[in-house]
From Swiss-Prot:
Keywords: Hydrolase, Periplasm, Signal. This is Non-specific acid phosphatase. The gene is phoN. It catalyses: a phosphate monoester + H2O = an alcohol + phosphate. It is found in: Periplasm. Its EC number is 3.1.3.2. GO terms for cellular component: outer membrane-bounded periplasmic space. SMART domains: acidPPc. Belongs to the class A bacterial acid phosphatase family. InterPro entries: Acid_Pase_classA_bac, Acid_Pase_classA_bac_CS, P_Acid_Pase_2/haloperoxi_sf, P_Acid_Pase_2/haloperoxidase. Residues 1-20 form the signal peptide.
Length: 250
């Protein structure tokens, strides 16, 4: 008898905790706004703006080994587990597949939309050389370097993602908007400190994230998911206590 009940309920249990992982993206890569069309070209070697890029790079390289450098290394990891760890205290609520499955799925979906789809056309078109390659330096996360060498630097996908994520989470938890905006900004700036991107890559990434945010507002599936995220992140059982949500230095 028990085995029959188990066979009946097991698919339902599995479905509950795997539905987030199998949910489809909100739109296809082809339906993204074409970043190669709307972004200006990255600064050339003779452009005065490139001097600013180099200054920003060396400013970041000068603090190698510092706590801020180590934060940049942590920010470089865009696995859903790490992003949840970083943004959970900022949003002031749990983010995990058990308690907040829709939010967990949203983190992964926004990475596809903002970090990959929205930046792809400009990255492929310009294939800009990354600063650590030009200067033959190491980044804050050496294990990523072989992949980064083959991926265009402009615009920054990490930055587009963090900008988009901060904006969407602010829709769900508007009372945490200033903290989310600040952490999203820091996350993008980490790419310059890490040596993976030029400042102009990060600046462009912020705009790409904002454009993708506007694109998602027109999609019913996103709005439906956002409503569930809002419900999860405002559930009293998922809110973090002051002890679990340390005060941020903002």
């Amino acid at each position: 008898m028990k085995s029959r009940y188990l066979l009946f309920f097991l698919p339902l249990i599995v479905a509950k905790y795997t539905s987030a992982a199998t949910m489809q993206p909100f739109h296809s890569p082809e339906e993204s706004v074409n970043s190669q069309f709307y972004l200006p070209p990255p600064p050339g070697n003779d452009d005065p703006a490139f001097r600013y890029d180099k200054e920003a790079y060396f400013k970041g390289y000068a603090i190698k080994g510092s706590p801020r450098w180590k934060q940049a290394a942590e920010d470089a990891d865009i696995s859903v587990e790490n992003i949840a760890r970083i943004f959970s205290p900022v949003v002031g609520a749990k983010i995990n597949p058990k308690d907040t499955p829709e939010t967990w799925n949203m983190l992964q979906n926004l990475l596809k939309m903002g970090g990959y789809y929205a930046t792809a056309s400009a990255k492929k078109y310009y294939m800009r050389t990354r600063p650590f390659v030009l200067f033959n330096h190491s980044t804050c996360r050496p294990e990523d370097e072989n992949t980064l060498r083959k991926d265009g630097s402009y615009p920054s996908g990490h930055t587009a993602y963090s900008t988009l994520l901060a904006l969407v989470l602010s829709q769900a938890r508007p009372e945490r908007a200033q903290e989310l905006a600040r952490r999203g900004w820091e996350f993008g700036q980490s790419r310059v400190i890490c040596g993976a991107h030029w400042q102009s890559d990060v600046d462009a990434g912020r705009y790409v994230g904002a454009v993708e945010f506007a694109r998602l507002q027109t999609i019913p599936a996103f709005q439906k998911s956002l409503a569930k995220v809002r419900e999860e992140l405002n559930d009293k059982n998922n809110l973090l206590s002051k002890e679990e949500r340390p005060e941020l230095n903002y």
